[in-house]
Swiss-Prot record:
Tissue: Widely expressed, including in thymus, lung and spleen (at protein level). Very low levels, if any, in the brain.
Coiled coil: none
EC number, as in UniProt: 3.4.22.64
PTM notes: In response to activation signals, undergoes autoproteolytic cleavage and activation.
GO biological process per UniProt: actin filament organization; defense response to bacterium; defense response to Gram-positive bacterium; detection of lipopolysaccharide; ectopic germ cell programmed cell death; innate immune response; non-canonical inflammasome complex assembly; positive regulation of inflammatory response
Main enzyme class: hydrolase
An example Gene Ontology molecular-function term: lipid binding
Pfam family, one: Peptidase_C14
Mutagenesis / variant outcome for changing K63E: Severely attenuated LPS-binding, LPS-induced oligomerization and activation, and LPS-induced pyroptosis
Protein name: Caspase-4
GO CC terms in record: canonical inflammasome complex; cytoplasm; cytosol; endoplasmic reticulum membrane; extracellular region; mitochondrion; non-canonical inflammasome complex
PTM annotation (Phosphoserine): residues: S83
Annotated source species: Mus musculus (Mouse)
Record-linked SMART domains: CARD, CASc
Length: 373
């Protein structure tokens, strides 16, 4: 019989039916104007592919910050974080409190570390007089590329973390490569850097091996801000206000199209695996430029040539774990150790794995954030 040759999968059928019912319900809510969405959000919802409408609705409700919106999202969208439509199936093991509570460094620990490691750590300015600034650039919507669902969670999370660490955060969204470069130059020229002790630059978008994509990017007409350009904008020649101060660059973006996992045998013999020729650093150039480019450290969400993954209803795995590690360990660990803990959280490989990567590190001392001081 036909039904024996093609047995139904009842759970799959029920899941699909549930999605259809939910989408129809959301369409009625939007059409009846019960939730009073902005006109641009309505248009975005109506123009979206049917399979994407639920995620467009989530983003629109997140902007409202209303009690009704919160109840709707909690009721309909509380699902397993590892099952989101082609996104990475990575285990989110960190407890919720670690994402919301920043552990503070006690005055005694602050005094001890400053006394014992005076020559080894970057000096921290007094909280009352310093003017720390941070810049977040996030591209979510693109003319030719897919929408980055869940990116709003990354903005909210990183902004909250940096504010808790004492930074005044500037957020810019939906920029072309030229627009990103212009915003960075304006940020680098801020007078507040003179009385600051450090800065954070957070870049979140689609990406390529050598740069971060602007909103107009396509294969035919690239719109990419080269990573080299960022270093040039903030180096000691062009940004004297941050000279000899830590400049931390966080990048959430793909750096190629390969997945980050491979299969190996449980054996001590060398394994054959897919490889690529990475560009070689030129030692002479590094020495020549060391006095110009110094006190940087970049932390990328993945290795060169590989993908980076994002949960449509919770944000990117990299940013989520980064925030968690900062909130738990910034009270006692310097920056490099915090980054190492983020990498360790990705150490167990799974399908669609990624490995965050520290790059272009020219810090000459340990950078402690000393939250609470």
């Amino acid at each position: 019989m036909a039904e024996n040759k093609h047995p139904d999968k009842p759970l799959k059928v029920l899941e699909q039916l549930g999605k259809e019912v939910l989408t129809e319900y959301l369409e009625k809510l939007v059409q009846s104007n019960v939730l009073k969405l902005k006109e641009e959000d309505k248009q975005k919802f109506n123009n979206a592919e049917r399979s994407d409408k639920r995620w467009v609705f989530v983003d629109a409700m997140k902007k409202k910050h209303s009690k009704v919106g919160e109840m709707l999202l909690q009721t309909f969208f509380s699902v397993d974080p590892g099952s989101h439509h082609g996104e990475a199936n990575l285990e989110m093991e960190e407890p919720e409190e670690s994402l919301n509570t920043l552990k503070l460094c006690s005055p005694e620990e602050f005094t001890r570390l400053c006394r014992e490691k005076t020559q080894e750590i970057y000096p921290i300015k007094e909280a009352n007089g310093r003017t720390r600034k941070a810049l977040i650039i996030c591209n979510t919507e693109f003319k030719h590329l897919s929408l980055r669902y869940g990116a709003n969670f990354d903005i909210i999370g990183m902004k909250g973390l940096l504010e808790d660490l004492g930074y005044d955060v500037v957020v810019k969204e939906e920029l072309t490569a030229e627009g990103m470069e212009s915003e960075m130059k304006d940020f680098a020229a801020l007078s507040e850097h003179q009385t600051s002790d450090s800065t954070f630059l957070v870049l979140m978008s689609h990406g390529t091996l050598h740069g971060i994509c602007g909103t107009m990017h396509s294969e035919k007409t690239p719109d990419v801000l080269q990573y080299d350009t960022i270093y040039q904008i903030f180096n000691n020649c062009h940004c004297p206000g941050l000279r000899d101060k830590p400049k931390v660059i966080i990048v959430q973006a793909c750096r190629g199209g390969n997945s980050g996992e491979m299969w190996i045998r449980e054996s001590s013999k060398p394994q054959l695996c897919r490889g690529v020729d990475l560009p070689r650093n030129m030692e002479a150039d590094a020495v020549k430029l060391s006095h110009v480019e110094k006190d940087f450290i970049a932390f990328y969400s993945t290795t060169p040539h590989h993908l980076s993954y994002r949960d449509k209803t919770g944000g990117s795995y990299f940013i989520t774990r980064l925030i968690s590690c900062f909130r738990k360990h910034a009270c006692s660990c310097h920056l490099f150790d915090i980054f190492l803990k983020v990498q360790q959280s990705f150490e167990k490989a799974s399908i669609h794995s990624q490995m965050p990567t520290i790059d272009r590190a020219t810090l000459t001392r340990y950078f402690y954030l000393f939250p609470g001081n």
